[in-house]
């Protein structure tokens, strides 16, 4: 398994944290910090992308979501991974006794929608499970596939609108990109970070699409 260097990890985490930290800065300072962080993350993502193996996609034969995720795994107490992500990504989230969110506000970075009902959001796998299967995950152990599907350390899980998640499906960046172009940099950085960590290969068209998205950094 390839682990991110400390520098790469810090820059990626800094990019992901921009919306939170920016509220404490002036508009101009926040914009400057965002541009610097995106530029650094984009440069490192290009280096990581250059290290990924380029290959043709494997067959989808044998794929089933159950090979990755029979169900969301329990994380802490009664909370499963999905519930942890919804609590992490939402604002003013209220949960019932079973840890299920019953109220909150979620922002979908893919399309810019502000959603006030848990029924309108999904937890998306940035690198879709079926896509990962064709990128090398078909050769993994069941335990490794479950770890991938429930990974809270890498930028693999994100709360998005149900409509955006359905539109994306199991497509790669060569076939689908977030409608909100301002998210292209972060999306590409997240995709590459996940693929590098799990040593998943990329296709030629996928690599070209990612490089185009990184121009937004």
Identify the meaning behind each predicted range.
Residues 1-31:
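Secretory targeting and sorting signals
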Residues 3-8, 29-37, 190, 194, ...:
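Mature exported/compartmentalized surface modules and terminal targeting/interaction regions
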Residues 15, 20, 71-72, 90, ...:
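Bulky hydrophobic/aromatic packing residues
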Residues 54, 58-129:
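Secreted/periplasmic proteins that engage bacterial cell-wall peptidoglycan
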Residues 106-217:
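Domain-level detector of nuclease and nuclease-like folds
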Residues 26-27, 74-75, 157, 187:
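Generic detector of short, well-ordered, non-transmembrane alpha-helical segments enriched
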Residues 28-75, 206-207:
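N-terminal module-boundary/linker segments of secreted carbohydrate-active enzymes
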């Amino acid at each position: 398994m390839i682990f991110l260097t400390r520098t790469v990890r810090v820059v990626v985490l800094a990019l992901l944290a921009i919306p939170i930290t920016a509220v404490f800065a002036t508009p101009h300072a926040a914009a400057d910090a965002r541009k610097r962080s995106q530029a650094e993350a984009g440069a490192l993502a290009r280096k990581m992308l250059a290290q990924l193996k380029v290959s043709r996609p494997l067959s989808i034969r044998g794929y089933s979501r159950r090979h990755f995720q029979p169900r969301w795994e329990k994380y802490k107490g009664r909370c499963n991974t999905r519930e942890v992500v919804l609590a992490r990504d939402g604002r003013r989230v209220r949960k019932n006794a079973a840890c299920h969110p019953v109220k909150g506000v979620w922002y979908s970075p893919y399309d810019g929608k502000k959603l006030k009902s848990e029924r309108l959001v999904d937890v998306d796998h940035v690198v879709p499970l079926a896509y990962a299967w064709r990128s090398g995950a078909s050769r993994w152990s069941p335990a490794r596939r479950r770890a991938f599907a429930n990974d809270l350390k890498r930028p693999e899980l994100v709360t998005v609108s149900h409509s955006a998640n359905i539109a994306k499906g199991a497509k790669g960046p060569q076939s689908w990109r977030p409608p909100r172009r301002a998210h292209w940099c972060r999306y590409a950085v997240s995709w590459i970070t996940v693929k590098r960590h799990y040593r998943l290969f990329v296709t030629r068209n996928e690599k070209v699409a990612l490089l185009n998205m990184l121009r937004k950094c």
